[in-house]
Amino acid sequence: MITAYKTIQNQLEKVSWDPSLKGVWLKLVNPTPEEILQLATTAQIPEYFFRFAVDEDDCPRIILGKKCILAIIHVPISHGDYRYGTSPLSIILTPDLTITISDESIQVIPDSTEGSRVSLDTTKRTQFFFQILYHADTVFLQSIRYM
């Protein structure tokens, strides 16, 4: 499933994605092969970036492409009753887009409906990338407290 967000007047808003839009965050949760192929073609991202992104056994790393960067991290996932595991979260940065890819909905990524206290600006992709990493770290530290 592909969901697009864009910062409009300092608010993170859900928008319908158009390849001509710049400064958009595309949130992919359990993407289908068709969605991956469509996005790889329209956003001009190497298809192998998406294969690495959805490989659950892949290790965290950063891959540099010609016009994009892929960062793969592991984030904590709650399985209830104080049981935690990790799940890969892949972040692709292009000049116009920030794309996050995960197998399941991850709380590390702020949802526009949650009224996040942090001001998220999707047009500032480097800052947005570091905010995603910060959220992952915060959730990880909260998870450790319950172990």
Question: Where is each model-derived feature located?
Answer:
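Peripheral, non-transmembrane regulatory/ligand-interaction domains of membrane transport proteins
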Residues: M1-M147
